Every structure is written in C-alpha cells, then in structure tokens.
Amino acid sequence: FFADRVVGENPDVDKFLMTNTHEGKYNEYPSLLFIDPFGYKGIKTKVLAEFLKNWGNEIFIFLNTKRIHAALENDKFEPLMMELFPIYYNEIKNDRKYKSTVAERLQLIIDNLGKEYQNILQNKVYYTAFKFQEEDIDATSHFILHLTKSSRGFDLIKTIYNDFANVGTVFDGVNTYTFDVKKITNPIADLFDMKALNIDKLKDMIYKAYRGKMLSAFDLFDEHQISGNYCRRHYAIALRKLCSENKLQSTFTDNKNHSVSVLISKDCILKFD
C-alpha cells in the first residue's frame, strides 16, 4: 500500500498517520515512524503531531536543513514552509535575522520544529538532533530529529547518538551530537578536548543545582537529564569527577564492591558538599 507513495501524495497516508490507535487508555500499536522526505516536501507537522499523540509513538525525521534554510528566504516556498511550521513560520522568519552564524540559524530550525509539536499537542515533547557533516567541506549536510513524549525515550536516544557521534562538541544550545565521515578517512587530532570541556560544563551545572543536597544518582539523572542533551554516560563521568574533587560523597547501599565511585543507580547515594 505504501511502497510507491510518500506523505502528501495520497490522502490515505495522512489518514493512516492520524488514526487514533488507542483502546481506552492503551495504545494497541505503539509505533516508530521514520520520515525521509525529499528535502522537506511532505513534512506535514500537524499530521505527524497526531501520530505522535498516541502513547508510545515516536518519530525520526531526516531533515535537509540547507534546503529548509534556503526555502525560508524564498516566498515561493511559503505553502510548504507553512506545513512544516504551521504556528511559528512568521516567528522563525523574523528570528533568523538576528542569528549571526549558519549554525545558529540551523539550530533555530530544529528548536522551532520542537516547539511546533509541543504547542500542537499541548504536552511536553522531547526532541534531540543528530548532525551529519558534509563529506568534502566543513559544513552541515543533514540532521536526524527525534521526537518523543517519553523522558525514557529521550534518555535512550541520547545514549545511541553518543555511541555514533565522532565529533567532540560542547552542548551550548547550538551544537549537538555530530558525525563527520572526514574524521574516519582523514583523522586529525582536535586542538582542544571538546569532550572534556563538555563534561566540565555539565559537572559545574550539576554542582550548582544540587549543592548541599542528598539523593540517589538515578534520581538526580532522571530529574536533570530532561533539561538538555547530555546522556547517561556524561552524567556518570561528571559525577565521578565531582567525587574526585571532593565536592560530593558517594555511598552504595547494595553491599557490593564497585570499581567506580558513581553509578547511575538508586543504590548509589550522593551527598553534595
């Protein structure tokens, strides 16, 4: 039925995506949807939001942000951009003027897409982007954008992104998990250890937020990870560094010997100075 179709060419596809699959409180068919459009054509945000509304459903969208970036500058593509940004189209066109770099303008696209789903569903939507660099130049090629209503799904996808990213980045609101094939074919040592800088940034954030408190490492992670792109491994390393700096004390309650000072576990109790 769908083999020779793309979203937008057949109304039955939109109808399928907008179907409520719940029986009472439960979704009979929790599903994962991967959208790989031709650039940006066929991305109907309101339709996809109806799919995401069903419990357990999650979405990956493969985005050619370069083409979206260009289309936002050309009024001829306004109908397509209005399908992509049904609420924030005018806002994103205006806000782009105040972004000084291409990276900031591309991140504005990602952030506004996340806002679209959250506004339409009137519910918390977690979104995370994975960036692909061009093969032959130092520029962004595509993003994969993941959307979920589940904090657990948000946790899991960040772990997967971290496993595949090969570019050290600092999560500063512009940069995200990144893969650059050039680093495989022509590996060059980075001038700065961006991964270490990223951990130090998280470490300082955690200490500022939890100084003087006591809680399990799991509860800290569960509470704090929903606020940003850092994954479970980042938190474990950052907490161990705080422990080595004597800024927190770690105690295990499971009566087992552990080779590390902190694990993201309910059995690992943290007491911050």
What are these language model-derived features?
Residues 1-218, 222-273:
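Class I S-adenosyl-L-methionine-dependent methyltransferase catalytic core
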